[in-house]
């Protein structure tokens, strides 16, 4: 499966000057919503991701995703795995579990995102699940931006990665883009202003 080509064909592989959720800057951005707007394609991708997870014989009860980006991927993965799905969301900049969702003590979860960059949002969701008595057994995403180690791709962990080293991450592919702090961003130095994806229709 050529994940990069799928993103390009869907108009989801964007080039410009972007402010990522991590606060870093990048010349490229992956708009997974453009990929997941096609239900058949979303099902195909998450069916494949479910097969990868199953091949590692990871036992889990439920899937949790951080809103908003992770919801479609997480829901489709839960469907493919015949598991329950819940999501966390930000309220006043703090990740929370709302809407009557509950976590049973000892319930095993995979945290699913659309894209994993450093893994910060996924880790926030994981900490909420653990605080309620749940157990995190792994992480999953359609794609990894090259910072976190990916179990099924045998890709190494880099310094910016925030996901725990003792838990596996499963993805369909790696996109290795450079990301920059604002202070050393070459695009900023050229006078360009970073745009938060979604703020201008992207």
Curated annotation (Swiss-Prot):
<keyword id="KW-0460">Magnesium</keyword>
<dbReference type="InterPro" id="IPR000836">
    <property type="entry name" value="PRibTrfase_dom"/>
</dbReference>
<feature type="binding site">
    <location>
        <position position="145"/>
    </location>
    <ligand>
        <name>orotate</name>
    </ligand>
</feature>
<dbReference type="Pfam" id="PF00156">
    <property type="entry name" value="Pribosyltran"/>
</dbReference>
<dbReference type="InterPro" id="IPR029057">
    <property type="entry name" value="PRTase-like"/>
</dbReference>
<comment type="function">
    <text>Catalyzes the transfer of a ribosyl phosphate group from 5-phosphoribose 1-diphosphate to orotate, leading to the formation of orotidine monophosphate (OMP).</text>
</comment>
<protein>
    <recommendedName>
        <fullName>Orotate phosphoribosyltransferase</fullName>
        <ecNumber>2.4.2.10</ecNumber>
    </recommendedName>
</protein>
<dbReference type="InterPro" id="IPR006273">
    <property type="entry name" value="Orotate_PRibTrfase_bac"/>
</dbReference>
<keyword id="KW-0665">Pyrimidine biosynthesis</keyword>
<keyword id="KW-0328">Glycosyltransferase</keyword>
<dbReference type="GO" id="GO:0000287">
    <property type="term" value="F:magnesium ion binding"/>
</dbReference>
<dbReference type="InterPro" id="IPR023031">
    <property type="entry name" value="OPRT"/>
</dbReference>
<feature type="binding site">
    <location>
        <position position="117"/>
    </location>
    <ligand>
        <name>orotate</name>
    </ligand>
</feature>
<comment type="pathway">
    <text>Pyrimidine metabolism; UMP biosynthesis via de novo pathway; UMP from orotate: step 1/2.</text>
</comment>
<dbReference type="GO" id="GO:0004588">
    <property type="term" value="F:orotate phosphoribosyltransferase activity"/>
</dbReference>
<feature type="binding site" description="in other chain">
    <location>
        <begin position="113"/>
        <end position="121"/>
    </location>
    <ligand>
        <name>5-phospho-alpha-D-ribose 1-diphosphate</name>
    </ligand>
</feature>
<dbReference type="GO" id="GO:0044205">
    <property type="term" value="P:'de novo' UMP biosynthetic process"/>
</dbReference>
<feature type="binding site">
    <location>
        <position position="93"/>
    </location>
    <ligand>
        <name>5-phospho-alpha-D-ribose 1-diphosphate</name>
    </ligand>
</feature>
<dbReference type="GO" id="GO:0019856">
    <property type="term" value="P:pyrimidine nucleobase biosynthetic process"/>
</dbReference>
<comment type="subunit">
    <text>Homodimer.</text>
</comment>
<keyword id="KW-0808">Transferase</keyword>
<comment type="similarity">
    <text>Belongs to the purine/pyrimidine phosphoribosyltransferase family. PyrE subfamily.</text>
</comment>
């Amino acid at each position: 499966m050529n994940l990069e080509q799928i993103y390009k064909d869907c108009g989801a592989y964007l080039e410009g000057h972007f402010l990522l959720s991590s606060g870093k800057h990048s010349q490229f951005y992956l708009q997974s919503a453009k990929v997941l707007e096609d239900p058949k394609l979303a099902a195909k991708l998450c069916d494949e991701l479910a097969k990868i997870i199953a091949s590692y014989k990871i036992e889990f009860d439920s899937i949790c995703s951080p809103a908003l980006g992770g919801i479609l991927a997480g829901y489709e993965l839960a469907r493919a795995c015949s598991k329950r799905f819940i999501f966390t969301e930000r309220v006043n900049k703090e990740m929370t579990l709302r809407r009557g969702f509950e976590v049973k003590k000892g319930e095993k979860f995979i945290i699913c995102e659309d894209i994993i960059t450093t893994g910060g949002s996924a880790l926030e969701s994981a900490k909420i699940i653990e605080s309620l008595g749940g157990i995190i057994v792994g992480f999953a995403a359609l794609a990894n931006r090259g910072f976190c180690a990916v179990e099924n791709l045998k890709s190494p962990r880099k310094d910016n990665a925030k996901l725990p080293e003792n838990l596996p991450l499963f993805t369909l592919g790696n996109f290795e883009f450079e990301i920059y702090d604002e202070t050393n961003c070459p695009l900023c130095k050229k006078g360009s202003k970073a745009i938060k994806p979604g703020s201008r229709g992207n």
